[in-house]
Amino acid sequence: MPRRARKFKRAVAPDSRYNSLMLSNFINKLMMHGQKATAQRIVYDAIDIMGKQENKEGLAVFEQGLKNATPFIEVKPRRVGGATYQVPIEVRPDRAQTMAMRWIIKAARKRTGKSMAERLASEMLEASREQGAAVKKREETHKMAEANRAFAHYRW
């Protein structure tokens, strides 16, 4: 029996405009220093930009981009004897989504010039077309897992 009480996940309220839990989580990940209103403005502006550029609903482009950047498998280091092996493991759906969000935000922040909303929109558009830094990161992760497939039996 564990000594500590179990830590439960807090329920996140869906966002006000699109009533989407995924978008609410994305806004929370983008938020810095508790400035939620600023993060919301950036995300909503980015969705509007994506909608105009693609002539589709912005939220659909957002969801497609997030889906394309979501990894299925990752590697975790496991120490066996004196060696550390990179063991490929499947990613839980909630963690996979979190990783994709993190990668997209990081890639958007690395881009130069323009406003954050425009950078985020361009990164999301590229992700929806299976291009961009976030999708490249996912491909890298999958390649790493494939290369270390021999150590899959060390899974725990």
From Swiss-Prot:
The gene is rpsG. It comes from the Bacteria. The keyword Transferase does not apply. Pfam families: Ribosomal_S7. This is Small ribosomal subunit protein uS7. Part of the 30S ribosomal subunit. Contacts proteins S9 and S11. One of its GO terms (molecular function) is tRNA binding. The lineage of its organism: Bacteria, Bacillati, Chloroflexota, Dehalococcoidia, Dehalococcoidales. One of the primary rRNA binding proteins, it binds directly to 16S rRNA where it nucleates assembly of the head domain of the 30S subunit. Is located at the subunit interface close to the decoding center, probably blocks exit of the E-site tRNA. SUPFAM superfamilies: Ribosomal protein S7.
